[in-house]
Amino acid sequence: VKRQEFTFIKKNIGEKETAFTTNLETYMKQYRSIFLKMDIEGGEYDWFKFLNKDESTRNLLDNVTQIVLEIHSLNVQNEQAKSLLKLLFEYFYAIHIHGNNACWFSTPEPDGCQFFNVFEITLLNKRCFNIIEPSNEEFPTNYDMKNTLHNQELYLYTYPFYERIVRCDYDVYKISPWNSVYNDKFEFDI
């Protein structure tokens, strides 16, 4: 269906501009309020190489107001994913995250913590907002749906989404919110 409000460009997203790929530079310079939805099965890392080239390419993110992105293959792209997120978090607030339950978890870090192998994240540009408070909403929310209906949902619970260290007398426990053996919901003070 053709509509004048939309322009469909038959190119893959990547690091370079070619006849078959775009790094979105032209569009990111041309438009000032971009909503970017990207689910390109690992190709986000090639696009990140372009974004991370220099300060001028990174600053193109100022023209993007929202990003909905699926990040893939943390089991093999772990360091690239961390670098990509670090860059995006300089410009954006993460307002939603959902683990793709079809892809389970990445290989555990050396410290034993795990994270989703594939996850969807929604980001809003910081320039559009004053300082926002962290949400106490549990993830997944009632609006989320499983990617695969017959698999268990993947839980992050509430902010902050990192492992918590619990000290009890002389013992120290690392509690991971990512469907570890500590999968139940509970609260505690650190």
Predicted regions and their residues:
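Rossmann-like AdoMet/SAM-dependent catalytic core
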Residues: 2, 7-10, 18-32, 59, ...
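Hydrophobic anchor residue in the Rossmann-like NAD(P) cofactor-binding loop of oxidoreductases
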Residues: 13
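Distinct, well-ordered alpha-helical segments
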Residues: 22-23, 44-58
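Short, Asp-centered acidic motifs that coordinate Mg2+ and/or phosphate
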Residues: 35
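Switch II (G3) loop of P-loop NTPases
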Residues: 39-43
